[in-house]
Amino acid sequence: NDYLSKIPFRDALLKRLTDVANYEKIGTPFKKHGKYYFYKNDGLQNQSVLYVQDSLDGEPRVFLDPNKLSDDGTVALTGIYFSNNGKYTGYTIACSGSDWQEIYVMDTETGKLLDDHIEWAKFTGATWQGDGFYYSAYDAPVKGKEFSNVNENHKIYYHKMGTPQSQDKLVYQNQAYPKRFYTASVNEDETILFLYESGDGRGNALYMKDLRKPNAPFVAMATDMDYTYAPIEVIGDKIYMFTNYNAPKYRLMTADINKPALKDWTELVPESENVLSDAGVIGEKLFLTYDKDAANHAYVYGLDGKEIQEIKLPSLGSVGFSGDK
């Protein structure tokens, strides 16, 4: 600080940076359960505010203002998660730049903060299934060593709304590999629970559990952590997969729920000369984003893997998609 304070143009540089950052920023709207949400920053707010409106031309109102989560601005909003039934909105926060996360839940309709509160979560979101959600956490650390102890034995829990964290159900742990990380996701119809294992390679292992069968075990889909395996949706018995397995620039494959092992997967959209950077299922179509010449290019494919059209963008830039299957 002594050195920086002696820079003669420091104040001028700060003023210039402040001037160029001080403009209104509005994010792309997204639709959830009949309402429209978007992030907005008036210019110099530390964090963008999430707004909601009842229709595209409706009056926006504040849904969640992360700047009010603390008086000193040390609490950051790290994620927001809407339940599939529309009743709840979970959000994760981190304090003072820590990796530790806390999960809170609001009533989506009223905005009321509910009593449900999760502590000592880490590297996680809130993955909803019914009136509850899956999350990843460690055991509570020794008091006074919250930021110095080595974290081991990452676990996945299920929290049922209206109950204390102490009653949360342990869904998965693997004490044979205490330094690995475990996270969960659920498809839109809440029929399949996916388990991701990472920390021993550049990618992840992937397992699945059929939630329609209460006592079904986790079944291995792919275990080589040198590759990335990401399910993007489940339609019928078919799991659509985004992966770089034997395809450095990524491709789409499909797996059968009844025969989910990697050896039985089928290629759907082959690897291209351009990197496939994102994929999703929206309105029974595949929306694919490729990186070409330092810009995104968007395409629509059928669920059969055949290209339908390129989406012509107004200019070079980046693009993203969101929506229901």
Language-model region placement:
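Peripheral, non-catalytic segments that deliver or gate enzyme domains
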Residues: 1-2, 8-62, 68-325
